[in-house]
């Protein structure tokens, strides 16, 4: 069983490189441990995840405010919150601070110490007052951010799971102290709902109540949502009750405009790691079956997550009449409607199908000689391999109904 699981990770890593999802960082110079570069389809997948998250938790709500804070912050931010003293992992019997330190300034006497942020949360807390002053929100309300974070991990490993540079999607949701348990449960349900919607296998999700000494120094309650990775059951996302720790650390408060009451809100924090989300979605989507006497690998993405919705292919790329029809009457039509449409005329049609299966493209559309006479095309389904003849005029609706 362990050998099969290791083999699955090898297949995922190999597919990601072969199909242009993810590459080792600085690969032509031997790489750099804990870093990865994103190829064309990896960027598309990651952007789909981020856009869906932002739409669900920001655009579709009236109590959420976005922010995009600077990666470099005044070092006093990290001193105030205890990160300089406490953000550490054990190493050789000592505590090793995993924040990446840097210097700002050109002249020696003006150089200031700063850090590459180890989390995106503080960028929201230091903008709490700005957000309240600008928008006058009523409790409960939240702030949301998507951005890079950095940690000097002692032992980066397991592909995207543990890296030194990664991306987070975080929410800080501000509530009254007496309401924290209600909203903790609310955000737990919201997180589980989002996981299912993006195509994570919910049979592989487990909730772990993190015990006192295992929790971060700012948390009074934490749940880890663990995923059954090939290398074991490990944290995917987290939900924390940060109490009033951060706002109190920054000496920030909130005045209720209705009764002029001054309070320090408490915070519920749903945290989503994008890189781990990508890995969980890839592992959930990866399937193999038998087609034409051969083993076929394909990524069964939800259409909303798929880097490509459909691939358009002229049956023969050396036949100008097929190429022209495919380009003008099919590709241009679908590209304008769906955006995530690509042109594929490389290799025979069987190889194109296999390539698009590994990319996770739900539909392949082939323009052949019959198309020139009856204005129909072959639409091939990724999951079943079945093919249908569809009128070009019906293509948009056909695809729209299935995504």
Annotated model-derived regions:
Residues 1-403:
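NTP/phosphate- and nucleic-acid-binding module
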């Amino acid at each position: 069983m362990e050998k099969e699981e290791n083999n699955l990770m090898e297949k995922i890593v190999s597919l990601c490189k072969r199909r242009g999802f993810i590459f080792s960082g600085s690969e032509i110079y031997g790489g750099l441990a804990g870093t990865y570069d994103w190829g064309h389809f990896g960027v598309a997948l990651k952007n789909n995840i981020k856009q869906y998250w932002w739409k669900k938790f920001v655009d579709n709500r009236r109590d959420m405010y976005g922010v995009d804070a600077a990666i470099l912050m005044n070092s006093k931010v990290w001193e105030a919150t205890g990160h300089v003293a406490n953000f550490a992992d054990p190493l050789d019997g000592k505590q090793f601070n995993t924040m990446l330190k840097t210097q700002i300034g050109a002249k020696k006497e003006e150089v200031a110490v700063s850090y590459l942020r180890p989390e995106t949360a503080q960028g929201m807390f230091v903008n709490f007052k700005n957000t309240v002053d600008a928008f006058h929100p009523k409790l409960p309300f939240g702030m949301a951010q998507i951005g890079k974070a950095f940690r000097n991990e002692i032992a980066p490993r397991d592909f995207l799971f543990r890296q030194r540079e990664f991306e987070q999607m975080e929410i800080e949701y501000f509530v009254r102290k007496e309401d924290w348990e209600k909203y903790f449960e609310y955000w737990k349900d919201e997180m589980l709902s989002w996981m299912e919607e993006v195509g994570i296998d919910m049979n592989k999700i487990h909730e772990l109540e993190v015990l006192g000494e295992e929790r971060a120094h700012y948390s009074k309650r934490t749940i880890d949502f663990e995923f059954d990775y090939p290398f074991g059951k490990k944290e995917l996302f987290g939900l924390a009750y940060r109490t009033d720790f951060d706002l109190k650390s920054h000496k920030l408060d909130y005045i209720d405009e209705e009764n002029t009451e001054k309070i320090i809100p408490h915070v519920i924090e749903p945290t989503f790691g994008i890189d781990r989300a990508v890995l969980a979605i890839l592992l959930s989507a990866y399937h193999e079956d038998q087609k034409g006497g051969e083993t076929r690998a394909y990524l069964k993405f939800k259409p909303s997550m798929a880097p490509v919705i459909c691939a358009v292919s002229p049956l023969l790329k050396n036949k100008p009449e097929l190429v022209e029809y495919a380009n003008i009457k099919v590709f241009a039509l679908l590209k304008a409607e769906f955006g995530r449409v690509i042109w594929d005329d490389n290799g025979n049609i069987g190889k194109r199908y296999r390539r698009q299966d590994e990319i996770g493209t739900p539909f392949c559309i082939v323009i052949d000689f019959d198309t020139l006479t009856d204005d129909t095309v072959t639409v091939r389904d990724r999951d079943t391999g079945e093919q249908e003849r569809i009128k070009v005029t019906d293509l948009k609706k056909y695809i729209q109904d299935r995504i």
